[in-house]
Amino acid sequence: MRSTKVFLCLLMVLGVCGQAQQSSSQVSKQSQPMPTEKRIVIAASTVLDGRGRVLRNTRIVIEGSKIAAIDSKAGPVDYDLRGLTVLPGWIDAHVHITWSFGKDGKNAGSGETTQDAAYRAAANAWATLMAGFTTVQSVGSPTDVPLRGAIAKGLLPGPRILTAVEPLTGRGERTGTPDEIREFVRKQKAAGADLIKIFASQSIRQGGAITLSPEQLNAACDEAKKQGLRTLVHAYKDAVRVATRAGCTEIEHGTMATDDDLKLMAEMGTFLDPQAGLVIENYLLNKDKYLGTPGYTEEGFAAMEKVLSLNHQLVQRASKVPGLKIVFGTDAVAGAHGRNAEEFIDRVRDGGIDPMAAMVSANSLGAEAMGLANQIGSIAVGLEADIIALDGDPLKDIAAVRRVVVVMKGGVVYKNAARR
């Protein structure tokens, strides 16, 4: 019922967005969608193809929503992006797109109105798209579903959304028997889930202890596979090994995983999505807005400060494990939407990740983890025309990720602030 109300409220947002575009030439210039059937040619001097290669002095031809050709002689040129760095739209594997601060400035909870929830969700989606993220995985809330639908139908501008709907929260035996967990997975599939999010550990604010048995995790991951769904498991410490052995798709966080755990993940083809900084930095920056709301205490904030260096060390260790697939996810919550790219800087500066590897983690590797490698994540013929341009070269200066000047998703230009 709440999701239905939010969807109706999202429709109301459209009228406000329309009025804003009419009253602001800057907004209309950057957000006015282009006809999707028009043939578009982009000229670029530097293209990161999303797979680890750099293309020089080429042109990208778009027809409808897809990349039709990469041809240095194509013309006429519609967008001259020479002097910028062109690359695929980024993919964030872990966000909470509907989280926001309420009217009182605090982390919004169940007391917010559906109207407020809808407005803020739409604003979060817009901020995320403008930051260069054309696909996100929101894990999860039932409110994700109407937002996903509104964006997919073109009613609202925002990134492509994949959602877990409701997560499976580990509470030991109270979580349910293996059969009950299987039923939970089937229920999420029926509700429209693209994946299953599983909490196999407490929050790091509560110590990060394991909360599900091997039998429970085996049931969840096995049933998800039967339903054609991927599994993302929030796991710390021992839960990393248990979830990996259960056959999950991706480990979220992974703090305090051992080197043997990381090697096991590489052997089993399990993706790792660590967070090097943004999520904790955002919590600390907005401490007054979270403190006192459910799950946020002084002790919890002290715990987060202590593990920040452990997160840096995890990224450093993981990057040295042959064959381990590290994807890009931010765990963006209230206060972080639109600042997702800061995680790139944290990973390169504090985690020692190679800048090209950082870009690939949010492009082709992120698409592979989502099972969408044949649709998004690369500048390649036949894939969706999700294309962004940066003022600067992130391979030389990772801070260039803050300077997104062009955003195209599915062949539609939503932002064009490139110098002319």
Region locations from a protein language model:
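Bacterial N-terminal signal peptides
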Residues: 7-18
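Histidine-rich, glycine-flanked metal-binding segment
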Residues: 32-36, 47, 51-87
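Metal-associated gating/positioning segment near the N- to mid-region
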Residues: 84-153, 215, 238, 243-246
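Active-site gating loops and adjacent loop-to-helix segments of metal-dependent hydrolytic enzymes
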Residues: 97-118, 126, 157-158, 162-165, ...
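Histidine/acidic-residue-rich catalytic or RNA/ligand-binding cores of hydrolases
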Residues: 101-104, 148-149, 240-247, 278-292, ...
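Divalent metal-dependent hydrolysis catalytic cores, especially in the metallo-beta-lactamase
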Residues: 118-144, 158-169, 191-203, 230, ...
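Histidine/acidic residue-rich metal-binding segments in metalloenzymes
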Residues: 180-190, 194-200, 207-272, 288-289, ...
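His/Asp/Glu-enriched, well-ordered alpha-helical/loop segment
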Residues: 226, 296-299, 307-394
